[in-house]
Amino acid sequence: MAIYSAQAPNSILEEEARFEAEVSETQAWWNSTDLFRLTRRPYTARDVVRLRGSMRQSYASNEMAKKLWRTLKTHQANKTASRTFGALDPVQVSMMAKYLDSIYVSGWQCSSTHTTTNEPGPDLADYPYDTVPNKVEHLFFAQQFHDRKQKEARMSMTREERSKTPYIDYLKPIIADGDTGFGGATATVKLCKLFVERGAAGVHIEDQASVTKKCGHMAGKVLVSVGEHVNRMVAARLQFDIMGVETLLVARTDAVAATLIQTNVDARDHQFILGATNPNLKGKPLADVLARAMASGKSGADLQAVEDEWMAMADLKLFSDCVVDGIKALNVSEQEKGRRLGEWMQQTGGNTGNVLSYYQAKELAEKLGISNLFWDWDLPRTREGFYRFQGSVKAAIVRGWAFGPHADIIWMETSSPDMVECRDFALGVKSKHPEIMLAYNLSPSFNWDASRMTDEQMKNFIPEIARLGYCWQFITLAGFHADALVIDTFAKDFAQRGMLAYVEKIQRQEMMNGVDTLAHQKWSGANYYDQLLKTVQGGISATAAMAKGVTEDQFEETQSSTLALESNIGAGTVLAKSRM
């Protein structure tokens, strides 16, 4: 990267020379980095350098971002997937490191378990915007600590001992939940700055409206326009460029299940906005009808009944569907109807990539003989002013096309684990962006048993969609659910059977499965800090935590033998091995 200096320039010419050198190096960075090969920026390297400070800062998260890119591109090339889940705490993230190659930090989990105000709640993104970055830092510090601890332990071993001790890569890249960016462009750049500083290798941002944000599997989702979300992506990328980092950007769309959209300003959204088709409602917008009903004293179920009656009368449809119905009703030959329908579909069909505005589509409809069509997208607007939106995979594809040049990974949120939806979205997006990486939420909000999959199909779901290009797949809340399941079942058992429940369900299981928290003092770093104290005090310490007398010696084993515990359980005997 460019030359930075905390020393003030000695002259205007030196100031300009530094600036130009930094611009050249920034452009060279973009040109030489594979991550940016397909990235579209509406700004220049000169714009970026103008927004930077004079003192260069380096970020550990940048190395993790490069590692994440290599990991995901390898999976993409092999048609496999990095599979992971939402980590709640340092215990989970250290256990996950043994088996998984990326880590997810969920806004839902943070909202319910770890906000910076300590006030829990549902996933509405109404917590302070440093909540998820703080959780990222919590986990990233833990990753670095366990890495340091392992290095000290391994370098205290002989070469033979190290050869028999598996090396664990604790530094697994973290992808974090950026929700909607938490407001306008300035909020998004500040959020992204926090993520880089706290250790995130990647960040995802979704296309819901910030003020009405919902969990992707709740009702009532309101989309922003395509253009507004593109601006969020650009703002995030700009902040990463200012900081000189290669943090991965994931664009998420909730367009499959969304029912509302903030505005009709973007032509790319027009084909999915619903309008009233009943001319008898002309001059009777829903918002006015509801306002009069409220003024007359109606509320609750009575008010809902008024809305339901109006919506039934309105007969909401897409403009395209109205045109198709109109062509079918024309007093022309069937052959001519077929020709006009074909022309309409050819020029408006999403599969061709054509995106007509409502006004262009209306002009085309008139050329095809549909001139007196009643269709009004303003009449059914909600009291908040939102337009009615018909969510679909097609809508998600159109958004994927728009987001692709500005993001590294595209994620379509879905309402069920549907292989057909996965295939259609992948093929649709890749028709314009063949090299784009895709992500998939293996959501615990799905009732997987209700999906009618066999156990074998569930087992193969991840590799099946990986072959379609979904190279990063994650269970958002698995850490939360695993934590709840273990604690609920253990607490119930402990209340009934006391210490036998702990020994049988926890301690022996840790032994048999080689879980390193069995020796929790060692896991927490007591040996590491003993070594640090000895280093400070010339190699000895009378107050070493792991010296003679520590109860953890009861679990100790040597490299040449294993400790076996023999316990009667009913009529049986269990041999358990402790691996420290």
Curated annotation (Swiss-Prot):
EC code: 4.1.3.1
Residues engaged in binding Mg(2+): 177
Cofactor field: Mg(2+)
Keyword Transcription appears in the UniProt entry: no
Domain of life: Eukaryota
Positions of short motif Microbody targeting signal: 578-580
Keywords in alphabetical order: Glyoxylate bypass, Glyoxysome, Lyase, Magnesium, Metal-binding, Peroxisome, Tricarboxylic acid cycle
One GO-annotated biological process of the protein: tricarboxylic acid cycle
Gene Ontology CC: glyoxysome
One annotated GO molecular function: metal ion binding
Reactions catalysed, as given in the entry: D-threo-isocitrate = glyoxylate + succinate
Positions of the catalytic residues: 215
Biochemical pathway: Carbohydrate metabolism; glyoxylate cycle; (S)-malate from isocitrate: step 1/2
Localization per record: Glyoxysome
Residues annotated as binding substrate: 106-108, 216-217, 252, 441-445, 476
Subunit structure: Homotetramer.
Function noted in UniProt: Involved in storage lipid mobilization during the growth of higher plant seedling.
Family to which this protein belongs: Belongs to the isocitrate lyase/PEP mutase superfamily. Isocitrate lyase family.
Name of the featured protein: Isocitrate lyase
Source organism (scientific name): Pinus taeda (Loblolly pine)
